[in-house]
C-alpha cells in the first residue's frame, strides 16, 4: 500500500529477478533519488527503525495483519530492515503460532547482512522522488 525502495541495488535486482520468475517478463531496476534532508526537516511524518527490534516487529506484524486498503499508520516515509524471505519465514511461524514473540525476536537477532528499505506511503512523499 505504498512504494518501496531498497538502498541496495543488488537486493533490488535480486527481487526483480524473483518477481520476473513469478510473473514473467524481464527484471528491471529503476533508480530514484530524493533529498534526505526532508526526513529531518519536520515536513514529513517519518519513522525510522535502525535494526530489528520489538518495535519494528510489532509495526511489521500490524501491517501484515491489516486487511484494509488504507495504511494503519500516518507515516509519509518509513525506513527500516527489509522483511526478506528469511525474516518472512519467521513472521509466518509467529503468525501461525509455531513460535512465541520472544523466540521470534531471538531468531531475528541472528539474521545476518540486514538490508534496509524505504516505504513511501503518501503521495506527498512519492512526489519527492526523482527518477535517475
What are these regions (language model features)?
Residues 13-14, 18-132:
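Conserved NAD+-utilizing ADP-ribose enzyme module
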Amino acid at each position: 500500500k505504498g512504494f518501496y525502495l531498497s538502498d541496495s541495488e543488488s537486493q533490488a535486482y535480486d527481487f526483480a529477478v524473483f518477481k520476473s520468475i513469478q510473473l514473467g517478463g524481464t527484471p528491471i531496476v529503476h533508480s530514484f533519488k530524493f533529498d534526505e534532508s526532508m526526513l529531518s526537516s519536520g515536513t514529513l511524518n517519518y519513522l525510522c527503525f535502525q535494526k530489528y527490534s520489538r518495535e519494528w516487529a510489532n509495526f511489521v506484524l500490524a501491517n501484515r495483519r491489516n486487511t484494509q486498503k488504507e495504511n494503519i499508520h500516518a507515516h509519509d516515509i518509513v525506513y527500516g530492515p527489509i522483511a526478506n524471505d528469511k525474516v518472512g519465514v519467521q513472521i509466518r511461524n509467529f503468525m501461525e503460532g509455531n513460535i512465541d514473540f520472544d523466540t521470534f525476536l531471538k531468531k531475528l537477532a541472528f539474521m545476518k547482512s540486514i538490508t534496509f528499505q524505504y516505504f513511501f506511503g503518501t503521495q506527498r512523499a512519492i512526489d519527492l522522488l526523482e527518477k535517475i
